[in-house]
Amino acid sequence: MKKTIALNLIIRNYTDRSIFNIILNGCGAGGAPPYNSGNSVYVDYTFDLGGPQTLTWRDAGTGVTTTAKNPLYIREEDMPKGVRYLCIHIYPDETVELTFTVGRPVPTARGAIILKATGNE
C-alpha cells in the first residue's frame, strides 16, 4: 500500500499566462492567473509519497497542455516537522518546484527574481 500525506495546496504561477486544469497525479488542483501570488488554498489534498509525480496544466490562451519538464518527488525527508502546505511553483521554462512549509509558502528565490523583473513583487 502506498504511503500518503494530506496537505494544503497552494499554486504559484510565475508565467505571463493564466493557466488552468492543473493536475498533479490525476488530482485536479485548479488554476492560477499570471504572476499569481498564491492566495488560493486548496485544503486537505492527499498525495502519494515518493515519485516521480506527474504535473500538467493548460494555457488559458491556447488550451495547450504542458507537462513539467523536470522530475518531481514528494518525499518525507524534504518536509519540515509539522508540514502543512505543499506549494507548486510553475516557471516560464515549464519547470516546476515543490516546496513544503509549516506556514503559508512564500515565493522561491527564483520566483522572487521573476516577480521583481516583471514588476509583480
Label the predicted regions:
Residues 1-7:
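Beta-strand-rich domain onsets/edges
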Residues 2, 36, 46-48, 79-81, ...:
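Surface-exposed coil/turn segments at beta-strand junctions on protein surfaces, enriched
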Residues 7-9, 53:
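Residue-level detector of short, conserved catalytic/binding motifs and their immediate flanks
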Residues 9-17:
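Structural motif
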Residues 19-22, 88-90:
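Conserved short hydrophobic patches within well-ordered secondary structure
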Residues 20-63:
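Tryptophan-paired
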Residues 57-121:
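Beta-strand-rich cores of mature extracytoplasmic or soluble domains
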